[in-house]
Amino acid sequence: MPTAGGMLRTKSVEQSIRDTDEPDAKLRKDLTARDLTVFGVAVVIGAGIFTLTARTAGTMAGPSVSLAFILAAIACGLTALCYAEFASTVPVAGSAYTFAYATFGEAIAWIIGWDLILEFALAVSVVAKGWSQYLGDVLGGMAPVAHLGSVTFDWGAVTIIAIVGLLLATGTKLSSRVSAIAVAIKLGVIVLILIVGATYFKASNLTPFIPPAEPSPKADGVHQSMLAWLTGSGGTSFGWLGLLSAASIAFFAFVGFDVVATAAEETRNPQRDVPRGIFASLAIVTVCYVAVSLVLTGMVRYTQLQGENVTLATAFALHGATWVKNIIAIGALPVHRRDGDVPRPDPRALRDGPRRPDSPQPRAYR
């Protein structure tokens, strides 16, 4: 039976590093700071840049949605400082699991390890489903699903997961090269959207930058932000509370930069390259989100972006540039390179668990 002392047992940094030198558990150190930066950008920027920006601007922040992304980036930057320090000190594949094991002990590490598995598994499922929907748009509206009696089989989602699984099995170097190509396409689509959107830009659409607060039944009750509940302001949209609510939503647009830390064990110089990769990817992503937000809210009035199904393409459609929707749909396929990069941390997070001395030996790299 586990004892309290055993549950609080920690694993030293030195032991964690020694475990990575075992012949059966050693990973190739192929990655550089550039590879990690590409990895981080590929994971963080998803189709949300085409949807989240429009919905947040139309229902919460108005033109100040760009400021909301800056506030969210600052919060992520503070978190990134912790990841950068831990990853450079403990350059092991387990990421938060390993960090918790070295500081809080075995029990907390066990909980965090399963949290990571759940997080990445759910992320892969959701993103694969989104990729399948965009594939349907590219195929002319034909949904990539098959109906087997009462069961609906999404072969598009299953196919992308299978392809990415095979790609990752070939090694991280090839996967990082594919990520580089996907990121190039992704950034190319974003730059094209910024250039075309700038032709419809009107500075008057950015006024007022922070719209006055107004009642909103959709932001009342359980749907209101914690800050609105604490201050007793009730269900309101826009204003400063709307801006802060938008920042909390925008924070989730940055989720994924932390997985760069899972590649520390495969990095040539983790003490130098992992922090560089984390902050470089975060900086690039922040610039992309802020630029898209500014162009979007400069193209149309924020009141024209209110609705459940508004996207970045909505702003172009209001100007008659419906052809941009096709570019966004095609561009969203490599954007969903997240399918390839979100699964990558899962085996990396799993890898350090079997190194525990009490792990089942068939699963252990010992």
Where does each model-flagged region fall?
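Membrane-helix boundary/coupling elements in multi-pass transport proteins
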Residues: 50, 78, 92, 115-130, ...
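TM-loop-TM module centered on a large, flexible mid-protein loop between adjacent transmembrane helices
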Residues: 98-99, 105, 136-147, 214-234, ...
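Membrane-interface loop-to-helix entry segments
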Residues: 152-214, 278-282
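Selective recognition of specific alpha-helical transmembrane segments in multi-pass small-molecule
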Residues: 74-78, 186-200, 254, 275-302
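Select transmembrane alpha-helical segments in multipass membrane proteins
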Residues: 30-40, 105-118, 156-160, 234-250, ...
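Extracellular loop-to-transmembrane helix junctions
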Residues: 28-31, 41, 49-149, 241, ...
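Hydrophobic, small-residue-rich membrane helices and short re-entrant helix-turn-helix hairpins
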Residues: 26, 170-183, 257-288, 354, ...
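Membrane-interface "cap" regions at the ends of multi-pass membrane proteins
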Residues: 1-54, 58-63, 77-81, 203-206, ...
